[in-house]
Amino acid sequence: MKSQLLGGLTPREFLRRYWQKRPLLVRGALPGFGAVVTKNALATLAARDDVESRIVERRGGRRNTRQGPFERVNLGKSNSTLLVNGVNLHVPGADALLQRFNFVPQARLDDVMVSYATPGGGVGPHVDFYDVFLLQGPGRRAWRVENKRFVVEAGDLLYLPPGVRHDGVALEPCFTYSIGFRAPRGAELGAAFLDWLHERGLPQAEYRDPGLAPASRPGRIPGEMVSFAERLLKRITWSRRDIERFLGEYLSEPKPHVVFKPGAGRRALARSLVRLDPKTRLLYSGARFFINGESIELSERNATPLRELADRRVAQGARLAGSRLGGLISHWHELGYVILEKS
């Protein structure tokens, strides 16, 4: 289905022609788009310990960055920007905005960062190493993307693939909503996988050399020690299933500052609407599910309705009220992973 959000393209057309290939500017992607969050509400979020925020101020040719939390947000009348990450975790409207982009797998969705800038405000020319949609809220912003210049207004949407140099400057007090995507790097992924293997137990062995002879060249690493290390490391093996499980747990792991609030009260699951908490990441591969860094494997019968919850982030409780699944949902509610609402 063609989407106004994507300039009249279907998601398939957009992904084929633009995704990770070239920028796209969509005028009027969300006509009449207003503020999902106010300036004061954004400042309130910036005061919290569980929210990442920063202020960037331009003075002459230099920019100064201060990290939050801030007891009080004081922005200059010009050349200042407040940026708050993960607004979708705290503001339902921002979470709904993020879900408009669910034609991209949930494993790739990251968060909604909101910036409020005074005239002249901006973070400066830079390159991101991830895909991003930049949706303009109230107020105008001038963009320079590579060698092109243009001005955006409320409801305009700019898509940028990784590696494209860009610079945005507020022409008047304005909001910009950045919908970012995760793109794990090889070194980061490799280090995390080795940690994951270590937690599950690596081969235990201790180097011994009872036949050691006096060293004629003390600085040389003994060949026997190299052989020992080679034999030991060759015993470290893994399967595709191990990689799948690691990746699911890794991609669903909440960010360090995320805190879940335990569910309050009891509600009959069969008469409830089950909604994932905005902070919850629920992914799956086959009948194995990954939620907030944990994994569980279910029967196909139980997996089918849970996939619906993962895909849509909301499901009728009656679909999830089986004995095994019902107990699981109740446990997740106690942990604050899901919200039970009146159906």
Feature locations, PLM:
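Active-site region of the double-stranded beta-helix
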Residues: M1-R17, L30-D156, V164-E206
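Acidic, low-complexity/disordered tracts enriched in E/D and polar residues
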Residues: K234-L309, S330, E341-S343
